[in-house]
């Protein structure tokens, strides 16, 4: 199987305040936990771009998601994009809206599994998942939306990682012609 190029994007209401005192924000720790879960599942399968934490800004998020999905530079294009945080009811949390704006097809089952794993508090998560081109995008909840600690985030990644390679490889298969249509010429 070919390498899966992964982009991990943390969304924070404030960026930089934790670093100034030598601490990591929850979003930075969440991105690191997601990366670690991927590497522990199959470190020879994933190439993780440096995790990025940005301020929760819808326009900037849409721009980054489009760039990571559509860039002609194959070294910078992502097959899998995982966002961490920004899915709660707060007016500043617009990750689901930004993600929906760039998606071409929905994959609601992934978000359903994440909400199930998060327990009752996951009712606060509005995360979505889907596809753009040959990239799979998944919104992972932050600490305020059902994953109050890193252990739950790691459990969610443990539940997803066995299926991610097949999901991503499915995006790269040739489309099947509709019934009755002639197959494409070879």
Annotate each language-model stretch with its function.
Residues 1-186:
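Non-catalytic beta/alpha edge segments that cap or flank active sites
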């Amino acid at each position: 199987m070919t390498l899966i190029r992964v982009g991990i994007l943390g969304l924070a209401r404030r960026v930089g305040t934790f670093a100034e005192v030598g601490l990591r924000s929850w979003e930075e720790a969440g991105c690191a936990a997601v990366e670690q879960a991927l590497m522990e599942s199959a470190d020879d399968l994933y190439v993780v771009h440096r995790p990025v934490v940005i301020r929760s800004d819808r326009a900037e998020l849409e721009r980054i998601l489009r760039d990571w999905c559509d860039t002609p530079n194959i070294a910078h294009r992502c097959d899998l994009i995982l966002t961490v945080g920004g899915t709660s009811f707060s007016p500043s949390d617009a990750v689901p809206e930004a993600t929906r704006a760039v998606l071409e097809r929905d994959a609601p089952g992934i978000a359903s599994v994440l909400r199930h794993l998060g327990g009752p508090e996951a009712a606060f998560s509005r995360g979505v998942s889907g596809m753009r081109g040959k990239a799979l995008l998944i919104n992972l909840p932050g600490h305020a939306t059902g994953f109050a600690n890193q252990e739950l985030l790691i459990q969610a990644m443990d539940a997803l990682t066995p299926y991610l390679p097949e999901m991503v490889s499915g995006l790269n298969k040739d489309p099947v012609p509709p019934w009755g249509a002639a197959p494409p010429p070879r």
